Amino acid sequence: MSSPSEIRVCLPPHDAVTPWTLAFYRERGGYDAWEKVLKNQTPREEIIETLKISGLRGRGGAGFPTGLKLSFMPRDAQGQKYIVCNSDESEPGTFKDRDILRFNPHQVIEGMALAGYAIGATIGFNYIRGEYYEPWQRFEAALIEARQAGLLGENLMGSEIAFELHSQRGAGAYICGEETALLESLEGKKGQPRFKPPFPAQVGAFGKPTTINNTETLASIPPIIRNGAEWFSSIGVENSGGTKIYSVSGHVNRPGNYEVPMGMPFRDLLEMAGGVRDGRALKAVIPGGSSVPVVPADAIMECTMDYDGLSQVGSALGAGSVIVMDETTCMVEVLERISYFYFAESCGQCTPCREGTGWLYRMIRRIRNGEGTHADLDRLKSVADRIEGRTICALGDA
């Protein structure tokens, strides 16, 4: 049996020397899709329909169909519209978008241009996590190259089509990964989630219709437009088309980003990451980042890495951030660290989250220190139940 291998769609080849440059990207067909759209003035609905057929779903966590999300932009909306890339990757275990921006920034730019064209937006913003200084530098350099090559700006390729793109660095707040908190921060305000409705497609950045997508999602668009919807959907499995970048960390021998077909068995992904370190037994896995439920070893070893497969074992794909834990792991300590993260990162806008996350962390810390009581277990459930479903954003549910 052959060993599992990567299929790189959003990440460049391993042997690439300077993959972040325009010259390298053009050699691999980069901007061909954008130039074809500009030359032919492809109908916007055609691009959206192609993305719908491809089966591309949001790679940031929610898994919402990308083509459908783009179609929510009101066609009759007059005036300015925006496309926004959410590169505020801040959840524990996530680091895929960092490598896309570091090594393949032009594909994100082309993806934003195509998505912007599809919804009628002439301006885009990439909101990049503040701690990602090198990725931000790479993206800024790529923007300069694209402008100099006439791929961004006014009257592109002699047409009346315009598209300009800007980057904005975040300031370290995890909550700004929530799309409406991101918009608040982008506008220079305190990063706190907005009430919905109205949704961003109606009232978004600066009060204008806005569509927000994840970095990996937008980077997937150019290859789909270039190679066709059927090509992309044939890579993955039913209901989970294409490739997915899994950020594997924890107790493995080769942690890192692995871009593989959706639906790959977890045991194959674990093999690619070198297996559990020191030959120890697997205890549990967090398959999609700290906001998704933990899966025990026996269940995850029989699971496929896609939306449906992980749902069947009571968890979720999330952002594809796979945290592997071996038999030496104390699960109470894991819970303590995760609960502290959400306590520290609560924006404080909603009382159940602001107060409840603190209560959860303090009780778990007490249990971790050997000072807990049986009553604490009941209190934990009681507090958690009073947070869930009572907050503006999903942080409380996490």
For each of these PLM feature ranges, what is it?
Residues W136-M262, G274:
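Hydrophobic alpha-helical positions that pack around
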Residues Y25-D32, C85-D97, P200-F206, S247-V252:
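Gly-rich Lys/Arg/Thr-decorated short loops/hinges at beta-loop-alpha junctions or inter-strand turns
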Residues G111-A115, P261-G279:
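Short amphipathic, charge-patterned alpha-helical segments
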Residues M1-T50:
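Cofactor-/ligand-binding subdomain signature composed of acidic, glycine-rich
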Residues M1-T18, A205-T211, T215-T217, I225, ...:
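Intrinsic disorder at enzyme termini
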Residues N104-A118:
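Histidine-anchored nucleotide/phosphate-binding helix
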Residues L51-M73, G172-E184, G188-K190, F343-E355, ...:
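Conserved phosphate/anionic-ligand binding catalytic regions in large, soluble enzymes, centered on
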Residues A33-T50, G79-K81, S87, K96-L101, ...:
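Ferredoxin-type iron-sulfur electron-transfer modules in oxidoreductases and energy-metabolism complexes
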